[in-house]
From Swiss-Prot:
It comes from Nitrosococcus oceani (strain ATCC 19707 / BCRC 17464 / JCM 30415 / NCIMB 11848 / C-107). HAMAP family: AIRS. GO terms for cellular component: cytosol. Belongs to the AIR synthase family. Its EC number is 6.3.3.1. It comes from the Bacteria. It is an enzyme of class 6 (ligase). Coiled coil: none annotated. The gene is purM. PANTHER family: TRIFUNCTIONAL PURINE BIOSYNTHETIC PROTEIN ADENOSINE-3, TRIFUNCTIONAL PURINE BIOSYNTHETIC PROTEIN ADENOSINE-3-RELATED. This is Phosphoribosylformylglycinamidine cyclo-ligase. It is found in: Cytoplasm. Pathway: Purine metabolism; IMP biosynthesis via de novo pathway; 5-amino-1-(5-phospho-D-ribosyl)imidazole from N(2)-formyl-N(1)-(5-phospho-D-ribosyl)glycinamide: step 2/2.
């Protein structure tokens, strides 16, 4: 039985580009970003951008029992402010910071990083600016940008919108893993300064902006409100890796969404709590502005934002001064902000006790 031939279509021919996906633009982007990615290379990188998989040779000879540590994160709705201000050069630093700072918490050295960039329509200049920022963040963290994915998805994202995700892998000697098990009552807590809200709390920030009389161009201290809100997240990897070589760190906490009250308990053993003295570090003007314009309680402020502390280092009392001096010598602002105490009967894991002697 002969097959019936379908009649020819009366429609004009279609291409992938007609559907909103420009393969040529994607290829152009890869060529644009290769020099930036190449600047991040480090021993172990075996491939360049453009392949199916990225290869990294683990320096196995340096370890007795190597443990891989992986992390993934995004930038959240801070992206909306970058898009609104048409400033895309530093949002990639935030992406690397959110991943690499999580990796260092376990004591791991970040090795390589991959990114995922999704948008409704690929604008090569904007995408290149973003990924060059990612590469700069990788340089700050000492991690290699070995690959990524650019997804052009018309109909999923509105015009001008995009999203980012990052993936980071590091390595640590098993016997040197930092898991909080060494934390004990009497340990001191050192806070390392943040540069602002970092990449957390921006849904609340945008809500405050909506009802505020201020614009992103309004002055705030010695910069604009937009500048303060787009200041990239600090990357703590290099100074902390160096600090690990000179003192024993009992725990590290990356202060992200949920602030000190939500992140410190993640690294505390049962039956121990953290006592924090908020008078021991200066609060950046942006946090005072957010509290005033949002009419935020102290509790809401501290459980939403980092409030000036981006990383907490838990050490033995005897190592406090050495750790503080070491961090300050490497350009970090750091303060003794609290201590570890036995958990009280009310079960509170983080207590704010302004003015108490440490």
């Amino acid at each position: 039985m002969s097959k019936k031939k379908l009649p020819p279509s009366s429609h004009s021919p279609l291409s992938y580009r007609d559907a909103g996906v420009d393969i040529d633009a994607g290829n152009q982007l890869i060529q644009r970003i290769k020099p930036a990615a190449n600047r991040t290379t480090r021993p172990g990188v075996l491939t360049s951008l453009g392949g199916f998989g990225s290869l990294f040779e683990l320096p196995i000879h340096r370890y007795q029992h190597p443990v891989l540590v992986a992390g993934t994160d995004g930038v959240g709705t801070k992206l909306k402010l970058a898009i609104q201000l048409n400033r895309h050069d530093s949002i990639g630093i935030d992406l690397v910071a959110m991943c690499a700072n999580d990796i260092i918490v376990q004591g791991a050295e970040p090795l390589f990083f991959l990114d995922y960039y999704a948008t409704g329509r690929l604008e090569v200049d904007i995408a290149a600016e973003i990924i060059e920022g990612i590469a700069h963040g990788c340089e700050l963290a000492g991690v290699a940008l070995v690959g990524g994915e650019t997804a052009e998805m018309p109909g999923i994202y509105q015009a001008g919108d995009y999203d980012l995700a990052g993936f980071c892998v590091g390595v640590v000697e098993k016997e040197r893993l930092i898991d909080g098990s060494q934390v004990q009552a009497g340990d001191h807590l050192i806070g390392i300064a943040s540069s602002g809200p970092h990449a957390n709390g921006y849904s609340l920030i945008r809500k405050i902006l909506e009802r505020s009389r201020y614009s992103l161009n309004s002055p705030l201290a010695d910069q604009t409100l937009g500048d303060a809100l787009l200041t990239p997240t600090r990357i703590y990897v290099k100074p902390l890796l160096q600090l690990l070589e000179v003192i024993e760190i009992h725990a590290l906490a990356h202060i992200t969404g949920g602030g000190l009250p939500e992140n410190l308990p993640r690294v505390l053993p049962p039956m121990l709590s953290a006592e924090i003295d908020t008078s021991r570090w200066p609060r950046l003007p942006i946090f005072d502005w957010l509290q005033r314009e949002g009419n935020l309680s102290e509790q809401e402020l501290y459980r939403t934002f980092n409030c000036g502390i981006g990383m907490v280092v838990c050490v033995d009392q005897a190592d406090t001064e050495q750790a503080l001096e070491f961090l300050k010598d490497r350009g970090e602002s750091a303060w003794l902000i609290g201590r570890i105490v036995p958990q009280t009967s009310d079960g509170q894991r983080v207590a704010f006790n302004t003015g108490n002697p440490l």
